[in-house]
Swiss-Prot record:
Keyword Repressor: no
Primary residence: membrane
PANTHER family on file: NA(+)_H(+) ANTIPORTER NHAA, SODIUM ION/PROTON ANTIPORTER NHAA-RELATED
Membrane topology reported for the UniProt record: Multi-pass membrane protein
Gene3D superfamilies assigned to the protein according to its UniProt record, in alphabetical order: Na+/H+ antiporter like domain
Localization per Swiss-Prot or TrEMBL: Cell inner membrane
The keyword Metal-binding is assigned to this record: no
Any one of the GO BP annotations: regulation of pH
Known function: Na(+)/H(+) antiporter that extrudes sodium in exchange for external protons.
Superkingdom classification of source: Bacteria
Annotated signal peptide: none
Protein name (database record): Na(+)/H(+) antiporter NhaA 1
Record-stated family: Belongs to the NhaA Na(+)/H(+) (TC 2.A.33) antiporter family.
Length: 389
């Protein structure tokens, strides 16, 4: 019995299993949205949830609590990982930053350029230029793990490192390009919350409740400020102390405690809430619109070309080296997987077009098709067309 429990625990904590769960939730969302439960699915997402304290009221649809709230926890974890890597990890050595940074840069610039070329001249459709710049790390990592032992572990580290810069890029894009009205009062409150966390950090105080209260205040104020609330997650992470005064790991403990919830609750719920594309409302004209073509080309072509090209140039001009034990074929295979935009692309799509059905959901379908093609082709290429160097 203990052996069975151990095997189940190992399976659940396996990163590849988290990716499989995302796939299941995606298919489930598509089935529910296009089946007899579609009305209940939409009612579930539009259900108003909130609270009020005096004159202050926060009442949002459940979908927005997922996209603005739960995903902030995901970005908080990304911030913790980024801080850990810069202070004590691989990024402490500047040379180790170059390859994933250049790869992420190429993975943002080239897809954005392809989307812009297809949609040039239309100011509204151009708002979606950032949709194909994102990568769903959980999906990409899950498929990489399924490709076999001949893929060196250094490529997994490369993909994770690239993902950190990719996510930071997504946060900056959201903060700069998808922010509308700004509230000075909310910014002042956010600044005070940050100041308190800075003082807590400098004093070496490691009471989780203090940081939690400050982070909630920061999140609400950022939400009300006009800047996307996910920014609060990564900002909070920067003020979490690495360790307690007794030398015990503090940041690492918080990060590890969040991994399960993010992999098996937050991201699957996000996938279920956002992947429900109504296929019955899609027409042929919308499928071949500039937005759909731009998204598909950006994710499936632009991502792999941009990531590989910038990585190759960094290696060719000796700014960086290939991940240990890997070759260019294997590196290219990982670059293909970065075209799996899925959850993050759906997220940015919702911000760009404000969850509008003006494209008859063809934009969401294009994200799913491009992500599916990138995943399948990346798996086939890595599994059957690469050899260990």
């Amino acid at each position: 019995m203990n052996n069975i429990v151990h095997k189940l625990k190992t399976l659940v904590l396996n990163e590849a299993f988290g990716g499989v769960l995302l796939i299941v939730c995606t298919l489930l969302a598509l089935l529910v949205q296009n089946g007899s439960f579609s009305e209940h699915y939409r009612e579930f997402l539009n259900l108003k949830v909130g609270f009020s304290v005096g004159e202050f009221e926060l009442n949002k649809p459940f979908l927005l609590w997922i996209n603005d709230g739960l995903i902030s926890i995901f970005f908080f974890a990304i911030g913790l990982e980024l801080k850990k890597e810069f202070l004590h990890g691989d990024f402490k050595n500047p040379k180790n930053i170059v390859l994933p940074f250049m790869a992420a840069l190429g993975g943002i610039l080239i897809p954005a350029m392809l989307f812009a070329l297809v949609n040039i001249g239309d100011a509204y459709t151009l708002k979606g230029w950032a949709i194909p710049t994102a990568t769903d790390t959980a999906f990409a990592l899950a498929i990489l793990m399924m490709c076999g032992k001949h893929i060196p572990s250094s490529l997994k580290i490369f993909l994770l490192s690239l993902a950190i810069f990719d996510d930071v890029g997504a946060i900056l894009i959201i903060a700069i390009f998808y922010t509308t009205k700004l509230s000075i009062a909310a910014f002042v409150i956010a600044g005070l919350a940050i100041l308190v966390m800075l003082i807590l950090n400098l004093l070496g105080i490691t009471r989780k409740s203090f940081y939690f209260i400050c982070s909630v205040i920061l999140w609400i104020s950022v939400l009300k400020s006009g800047v996307h609330a996910t920014l609060a997650g990564i900002v909070t992470a920067f003020f979490i102390p690495m360790q307690t005064k007794n030398g015990e790991a503090f940041l690492e403990e918080i990060y590890e405690s969040l991994k399960f919830w993010i992999a098996f609750i937050i991201l699957p719920l996000f996938a279920f809430a956002n992947a429900g594309v109504n296929l019955s409302n899609i027409d042929i004209g919308a499928i071949f619109s500039g937005v759909s073509i731009g998204i598909f080309l950006g994710l499936f072509v632009g991502k792999q070309v941009g990531v590989f090209l910038f990585s190759y140039l960094a290696i060719r001009f000796k700014f960086a080296a290939l991940p240990q034990g890997s070759n260019l074929k294997q590196l290219y295979g990982v670059c293909i997987l970065t075209g799996i935009g899925f959850t993050m692309s759906l997220f940015i799509d919702g911000l760009a077009y404000e969850v509008s059905d003006i494209f008859n959901y063809a934009d969401n379908l294009a994200i799913l098709i491009a992500s599916f093609c990138s995943g399948i082709w990346g798996f086939i290429y890595l599994k059957f067309f690469t050899t260990r160097s």
